[in-house]
Curated annotation (Swiss-Prot):
Top-level taxonomic group: Eukaryota
Mode of membrane association: Peripheral membrane protein
Region of interest (Disordered), ranges: 1-89, 115-142
GO biological process: early endosome to Golgi transport; intracellular protein transport; lamellipodium morphogenesis; receptor internalization; retrograde transport, endosome to Golgi
Domain (BAR) ranges: 302-522
Note: Binds phosphatidylinositol 3-phosphate (PtdIns-(3)P) and phosphatidylinositol 3,5-bisphosphate (PtdIns-(3,5)P2) in liposome-based assays. Can bind PtdIns(3,4,5)P3 in protein:lipid overlay assays, but not in liposome-based assays.
UniProtKB keywords: Acetylation, Cell projection, Endosome, Golgi apparatus, Lipid-binding, Membrane, Phosphoprotein, Protein transport, Transport
Source species: Macaca fascicularis
Subcellular location: Endosome membrane; Golgi apparatus, trans-Golgi network membrane; Early endosome membrane; Cell projection, Lamellipodium
Residues with the Phosphoserine modification: 32, 39, 58, 72, 188, 280
GO molecular function terms attached to this record: phosphatidylinositol binding
Residue ranges with Acidic residues bias: 35-45, 132-142
Name of this protein: Sorting nexin-1
Modified residues (Phosphothreonine): 41, 48
């Protein structure tokens, strides 16, 4: 088509003569083909310089130049003009400083639009939501609020006695009336707070931290027994457990904004919590409801559409089993450490008696000092047993209960899904009933059937939204729970290792101090 176009233009008009060329040199340039080439090149100069050329002519002219490039290359003018389009395409992706600005402005944006944005868009859409969620969770976790539980005090006598704890709060949040305040709370108040929060938030998929478990034996000893070491140990364990429970409550952004939590922390007197006793009617009803829920959960077979929930539930169940095994081992370790402390104390007493009856002065003094060292070691073992319990055993016990609440959140999501499926099945039955009424030609009942269909369609839509909402909440709550769990375990393990290191350093210090006395025995 290039050669044909050149012949047509040569027949209609003659190209202007090139200055400085003689007829002999033109004839030696190659006959008719150079003339066609000359006419094409001259026509190109005319069209590129014209201001009325449309945008659709530029790519056509460019394609017409490509076949000419394979033609005669003996003319120097052809070589320059044939190389110029190649320079345009080669430089278009690198720089924009060329003479033909119109062609560059059309070609360069097309290549940048294809190459750059599609590479950045998927990454931003894929990773940005997770980053925002994590950043939001970090901001939510930074609360300037600290609660402390101190001064357990026995009030009353006999079986009507109870223990009141001083709950102190320090905060700069504008939610509260002052920066520091304190109230008195009994154990049933903590249980009542959990019941209120669980009733409001658990059905929406939130993980409400559970309170410490009841202990009938321990509390009975406190009520009717005298103030001995076992009662003091029980009260200290419960005080620490209540403090951890309340701190987890106020660390949760949703729970902190609940009016019941603020009332619990600020109000001087609370109404008596009902239904918190184990053997009460409400307590027995709760046990029955839990058993019913367990049976119904076994009958529900959910077709999980999101593999994340299925995998995460399996992880939670496996982790709960492993934590139970580890907790049993740590409790055994605590008991062994306490036995070691008792045996060390008996060993110290025996050494002291032996040293007092020894005639050799140096040996008697060495045995007496060894008995003192063993007494110090007995204190170290006792302290380490307490550290084993409060830093490891109690941490594992808390997270065993927390994992049970996490499983309950998954179960609540399953119940919401089952309610949605039941509504869909009911809607299908209503539609089938409407079809039967239409077939039987009963217009008097048809309007009622249509109203019921509209009602159940609205329910299906609402239950579907509820399922989507609780799925979002459970996912976010599990992510937050895992983050808090990692922080808790890190802090407790570091503290536990520091106590072990301190214990070993003290042991080395005691033995190094005693070694010269042992060497001085003659």
């Amino acid at each position: 088509m290039a050669s044909g176009g050149g012949g047509c233009s040569a027949s209609e008009r003659l190209p202007p003569p090139f200055p400085g060329l003689e007829p002999e040199s033109e004839g030696a340039a190659g006959g008719s083909e150079p003339e066609a080439g000359d006419s094409d090149t001259e026509g190109e100069d005319i069209f590129t310089g014209a201001a009325v050329v449309s945008k659709h002519q530029s790519p056509k002219r460019t394609t017409s130049l490509l076949p000419i490039n394979n033609g005669s290359k003996e003319n120097g003018i052809h070589e320059e003009q044939d190389q110029e389009p190649q320079d345009l395409f080669a430089d278009a992706t690198v720089e924009l400083s060329l003479d033909n600005t119109q062609n560059n402005q059309k070609k360069v944006p097309a290549k940048t639009l294809i190459s750059l944005p599609p590479q950045e868009a998927p990454n931003s859409s894929k990773h940005q939501p997770t980053y925002e969620e994590l950043e939001e969770e970090e901001q939510e976790d930074q609360f300037d609020l600290t609660v402390g539980i101190t001064d357990p005090e026995k009030i009353g006598d006999g079986m009507n006695a109870y223990v009141a704890y001083k709950v102190t709060t320090q905060t700069s949040l504008p939610l509260f009336r002052s920066k520091q305040f304190a109230v008195k709370r009994r154990f049933s108040d903590f249980l009542g707070l959990y019941e209120k929060l669980s009733e409001k938030h658990s059905q929406n998929g939130f993980i409400v931290p559970p309170p410490p478990e009841k202990s009938l034996i321990g509390m009975t000893k406190v009520k009717v027994g005298k103030e001995d070491s076992s009662s003091a140990e029980f009260l200290e364990k419960r005080r620490a457990a209540l403090e951890r429970y309340l701190q987890r409550i106020v660390n949760h952004p949703t729970m902190l904004q609940d009016p019941d939590v603020r009332e619990f922390l600020e109000k001087e007197e609370l109404p008596r919590a009902v239904g918190t006793q184990t053997l009460s009617g409400a307590g027995l009803l709760k046990m029955f409801n839990k058993a019913t829920d367990a049976v119904s959960k076994m009958t529900i077979k959910m077709n999980e559409s999101d593999i994340w929930f299925e995998e995460k539930l399996q992880e939670v169940e496996c982790e709960e089993q492993r934590l139970r095994k580890l907790h049993a081992v740590v409790e055994t370790l605590v008991n062994h450490r306490k036995e070691l402390a008792l045996n060390t104390a008996q060993f110290a007493k025996s050494l002291a008696m032996l040293g007092s009856s020894e005639d050799n002065t140096a040996l008697s003094r060495a045995l007496s000092q060894l008995a003192e060292v063993e007494e110090k070691i007995e204190q170290l073992h006792q302290e380490q047993a307490n550290n084993d319990f409060f830093l490891l055993a109690e941490l594992l016990s808390d997270y065993i209960r927390l994992l049970a609440i996490v499983r309950a959140a998954f179960d609540q999501r399953m119940k919401t899904w089952q309610r949605w499926q039941d509504a869909q099945a009911t809607l299908q039955k209503k539609r089938e009933a409407e079809a039967r009424l239409l077939w039987a030609n009963k217009p008097d009942k048809l309007q009622q059937a249509k109203d019921e269909i509209l009602e159940w369609e609205s329910r299906v839509t609402q239950y579907e939204r509820d399922f989507e909402r609780i799925s979002t909440v459970v996912r976010k709550e599990v992510m937050r729970f895992e983050k808090e769990k990692s922080k808790d375990f890190k802090n407790h393990v570091i503290k536990y290792l520091e106590t072990l290191l301190y214990s070993q350093q003290q042991l080395a210090k005691y033995w190094e101090a005693f070694l010269p006395e042992a060497k001085a025995i003659s």
